[in-house]
């Protein structure tokens, strides 16, 4: 509920669990220590992206460490950061206090970690950093580049964290 509250205060579309009670299950699952990966399947416009950002906010508050938000393209990444993610972070007093600086490809956090903002179209971004928590958005729009699958490359970034890593997609 605290994560949903952060999204609601962001000024964007509210994450209303009274209207979309089915989102509570994946949010609760993500917050359980024993759960490593949550896969959310659903139709268009049911709140999957808001759910993803609520889990990102919860992770910032309760799981310090490097995070990665994976998007299909640079354009979608830039649009989402400006229209959804940044307003959510600025709209929550708890999350706003954690942010040190916004950059094009990452958000620096005051605890010395970051939220890496990666795209599926860049093999170098998919292979350049190890992350504790991975947030995969719009994976059905990922284009295969080269021999590898963008989703598998992104998931591979969490391998060093073993059973402590978390993925939501």
List each model region and its residues.
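Phosphate/NTP-binding elements of NTP-utilizing enzymes
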Residues: 1-169
């Amino acid at each position: 509920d605290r994560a949903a509250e952060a999204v609601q205060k962001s000024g964007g579309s509210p994450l209303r669990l009274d209207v979309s009670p089915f989102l509570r299950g994946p949010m609760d699952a993500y917050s359980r220590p024993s759960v490593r990966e949550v896969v959310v399947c659903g139709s268009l416009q049911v709140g999957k992206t808001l759910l993803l950002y609520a889990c990102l906010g919860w992770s910032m508050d309760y799981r310090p460490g490097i995070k990665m938000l994976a998007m299909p393209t640079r354009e979608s990444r830039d649009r989402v950061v400006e229209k959804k993610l940044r307003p959510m972070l600025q709209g929550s007093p708890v999350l706003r206090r954690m942010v040190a600086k916004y950059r094009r490809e990452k958000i620096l956090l005051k605890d010395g970690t970051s939220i890496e903002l990666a795209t599926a179209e860049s093999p170098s971004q998919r292979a350049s950093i190890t992350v504790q928590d991975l947030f995969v958005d719009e994976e059905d729009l990922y284009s295969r580049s080269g021999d590898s699958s963008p989703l598998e490359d992104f998931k591979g970034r969490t391998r060093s964290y073993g059973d402590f890593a978390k993925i939501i997609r």
